[in-house]
């Protein structure tokens, strides 16, 4: 992740994604002298929003969180709606991919966004609803960046299966959280609604 050196590139690491928010707070609280340490908030967009909440659950220096179109990338089980045997098959496939990666001398990668942005929404290829939504932002000039093309090692999904960004969301309370969604049912799963309820009750 990021632009640091080392191989393999594009490893999706949920703990490091969350750590990035705390690292930003480190910087703001030590290097940005005009910043009040007691008034630092974070904003998480799309997949980053879940990790912003994960960071805030343990980093009390984060005084509030704003999420925009939050997407919990660690909730593979919920997103894929897999039966137990399908979940086992997925884990087995990903686990064995680690051997393949080692023997091939390089990791297998998820498909990525295009190398150049599309000119308009009409030019975008048609995929499933979730991929279409991503492409409408990240594959167009407004959201495209050459270093953020959605590529990750295939085995990164193992880390997403063993880490849950929202497990400790209730520990953020009483610090405020603002959830911004385009519409009322956009990716709000049961676990997310319970988290909101807990925060509002307590």
Region spans (language model):
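Catalytic histidine neighborhood in serine/cysteine hydrolases
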Residues: 198-202
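Conserved alpha/beta-hydrolase "acid-adjacent" motif
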Residues: 164, 181, 185-192
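Catalytic nucleophile-loop/oxyanion-hole region of alpha/beta-hydrolase
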Residues: 2-41
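Short beta-strand/loop motif that positions the catalytic acidic residue
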Residues: 172-173, 178-181
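Alpha/beta-hydrolase-fold enzymes
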Residues: 51-136
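Gly/Ala-rich beta-loop-alpha elbow adjacent to hydrolase catalytic centers
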Residues: 44-48, 52
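Short beta-strand immediately N-terminal to the catalytic nucleophile in serine-hydrolase-like folds
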Residues: 41-44, 66-68
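Hydrophobic, aromatic-rich cap/lid helix
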Residues: 140-161
């Amino acid at each position: 992740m990021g632009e640091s050196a080392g191989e393999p590139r594009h490893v999706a690491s949920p703990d490091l994604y969350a750590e990035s928010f705390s690292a930003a707070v480190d910087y703001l609280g030590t290097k940005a002298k005009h910043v009040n340490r007691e008034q630092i908030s974070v904003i998480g967009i799309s997949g980053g929003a879940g990790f912003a909440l994960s960071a805030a659950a343990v980093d009390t220096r984060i005084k509030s969180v704003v999420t925009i179109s939050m997407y919990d990338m660690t909730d593979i089980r919920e997103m894929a709606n897999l039966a137990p045997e399908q979940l086992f098959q997925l884990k087995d496939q990903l686990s064995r991919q680690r051997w393949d990666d080692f023997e091939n001398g390089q990791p297998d990668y998820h498909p990525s966004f295009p190398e150049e942005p599309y000119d308009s929404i009409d030019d975008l290829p048609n995929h499933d609803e979730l991929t279409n939504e991503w492409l409408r932002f990240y594959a167009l000039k407004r959201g495209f960046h050459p270093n953020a093309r959605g590529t990750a090692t295939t085995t990164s999904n193992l880390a997403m299966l063993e880490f849950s960004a929202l497990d400790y969301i209730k520990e953020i309370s009483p610090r405020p959280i603002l959830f911004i969604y385009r519409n009322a049912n956009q990716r709000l799963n049961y676990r997310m609604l319970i988290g909101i309820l807990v925060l509002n009750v307590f």
